[in-house]
Design a protein with these regions (language model features):
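Bacterial N-terminal signal peptides
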Residues: 7-17
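Mature N-terminal segment immediately following signal peptide/propeptide cleavage
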Residues: 32-68
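M16/MPP (pitrilysin/insulinase) zinc-metallopeptidase core fold and M16-derived inactive scaffolds
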Residues: 68-130, 174, 193-197, 308-326, ...
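Short acidic/His-enriched helical or mixed secondary-structure segments at domain edges of catalytic enzymes
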Residues: 164-183, 260-279, 316-325, 370-423, ...
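C-terminal soluble interaction/assembly domains
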Residues: 368, 406, 410-442, 446-479
Length: 488
């Protein structure tokens, strides 16, 4: 027995030694390519009663039920004299109750079931989302459709909501980052629905009748797309939704015209005085829509310029090399049916504001004038290829992606062709779109900070700021009245 044990131990050590001898250095390890093919949206698309469209997937992995109603309505459809209606709607669709249910009773019942029911209003799309256990599907779905179809907007919760929002206006100018993004867009977009802000008068002017009229105009079966997933059979859920949607009138919603003409602001420095020890900066101009054929090349280009975190040029220069900031980069924002914005951004101490801006502008020029490297291209393209599957991590996320495609009118093969379009981007295309969509000579430089130390500068970049362009002093808007406040 003793000899047997010794032999076994010896064999074990020999095998272990062989395994160690065969082990590779981590740098030599290879992994198979990640292969993920998004499903075909058409396989999940159904139409329920009244023309109510949906993308539906059975998912038996957990005993859950999820449904989201994506509605084509939002803040851009609200008239100027009712600015803030979307925010009130977002708060009151559930809290205001329905014809047969009190709002607090709905919230308490959802909490008791361990579920969630939420409503959000965006610029052109709003969403009502429910998540409950499969055993509570019938009760949860009934409440979901009751809220979606029959909101009551009761006076008492509406009164409290308006008072709360008016009070919150007092803090509208407190956060420099909030002020920066709001006023930057005001300069670039001008006076239209994109930049209209609620005031005390517009909040207080919103009535229950206004909310009912807005709801009646946009909440109809042909203006809603559902995303549905969970532990159910498709046929069974169809019968339930058909029953709950029966009799829901589907009128033809009319949508206000979106702004098409925008101002051409004078390039230069637009300064907002705030007694803080840092400067918050955005510099840029209007960008493009995400339906633009150049979108994919622009995404790769911006990743290299400033969107790729620690691998990007702006972060490398401003943060790693110069140590000026923890928050810097560049971004293209996108809006459905409207051009987004392009901006470089940085948050840095007052004395280095001018220097940081000069470094970012130099990177704008460099990516326009010099080809990017092979390594930069590989990193950027691999980022988009390797992160592509993240948008499909759950059945509900996948159905929401498909619902958004249909809502915004993008082709159903958008995700199937996404990676090939990214892979088709070349170094020449990166330089081409940089020259086409980045215009340093037309850039607005918006700064929120303390003017005197920002204007003075520091050792590496002594002021004044007008070396960057003509200085425009911008007065803040009084959020209560919407009128300009005079700087002391």
């Amino acid at each position: 027995m003793k000899r047997t044990i010794i032999a076994i131990l010896a064999l074990t050590f020999i095998c272990a030694g062989l395994g160690l001898a065969q082990a590779k250095h981590p740098s030599e390890l290879t992994y198979p390519a990640l292969k993920y093919e998004p499903p075909d949206p058409k396989a999940f698309r159904v139409v329920y009663a009244g023309g109510l469209r949906a993308f539906v997937q059975e998912d038996r992995s957990l005993p859950l039920f999820n449904i989201t109603a994506l509605v084509n309505c939002g803040d851009l459809y609200v008239p100027k004299d009712k600015a803030g209606l979307g925010r009130i709607l977002g708060d009151q669709l559930i809290k205001g109750g329905t014809a047969t249910r009190d709002g607090s009773a709905i919230e308490e019942r959802i909490d008791f079931l361990g579920g969630s029911l939420n409503f959000m209003v965006g610029e052109r799309t709003s969403s009502l989302s429910l998540s409950v256990l499969e055993k509570d599907l019938d009760e949860g779905l009934a409440m979901f459709f009751d809220v979606l179809r029959n909101p009551a907007f009761r006076e008492e919760p509406l009164k409290l909501a308006k008072a709360r929002f008016v009070e919150q206006l007092r803090q509208a100018n407190d956060q420099p980052g909030t002020v920066l993004s709001r006023e930057y867009e005001r300069i670039l977009y001008g006076d239209n629905a994109v930049t209209w802000q609620a005031t005390k008068a517009t909040f207080e002017g919103v009535t229950a009748a206004d909310l009912q009229a807005f709801h009646a105009k946009y909440f109809s079966p042909r203006n809603v797309i559902l995303a549905v997933s969970g532990d159910f059979a498709k046929a069974a859920i169809k019968a339930k939704i058909d029953k709950l949607a029966a009799g829901w009138k589907s009128g033809a919603a009319s949508f206000p015209a979106l702004p098409k003409a925008f101002p051409t602001p004078e390039p230069g420095v637009y300064f907002i005085q705030k007694a803080i020890n840092q400067g918050y900066v955005s510099l840029g101009h209007l960008g493009l829509e995400d339906t633009n054929p150049d979108y994919f090349a622009v995404q790769v280009m911006n990743f290299i310029l400033g969107g790729g975190s620690f691998t990007s040029r702006i972060t490398t220069k401003v943060r790693s090399d110069e140590g000026l900031s923890y928050n810097q980069g560049s971004r293209f924002t996108y809006r459905w049916g409207l051009p987004g914005t392009f901006s470089g951004y940085v948050q840095t101490k007052s004395s280095t504001v001018g220097y940081a801006i000069s470094l970012i502008r130099a990177e704008f020029d460099r990516i326009r004038k010099e080809p990017v490297s092979d390594a930069e291209m590989e990193t950027a393209i691999n980022y988009y290829l390797e992160s592509f599957a993240d948008g499909f991590q759950s059945a509900q996320a996948t159905m929401m992606s498909f619902a958004n495609l249909e809502m915004t009118g993008k082709p159903m093969d958008y995700y199937r062709t996404f990676r090939s379009r990214i892979q088709a981007v070349t170094k020449a295309r990166v330089q081409e779109v940089a020259q086409k969509y980045i215009h340093p000579d037309k850039a607005v430089i918006m700064i929120v900070g303390d003017f005197e130390p920002c204007n003075k500068g520091g050792d590496k970049w002594p002021g004044p700021l007008d070396k960057l362009g003509r200085i425009h002093k911008i007065n803040l808007i009084d959020p209560m009245t919407g009128l300009e406040m005079k700087t002391p």
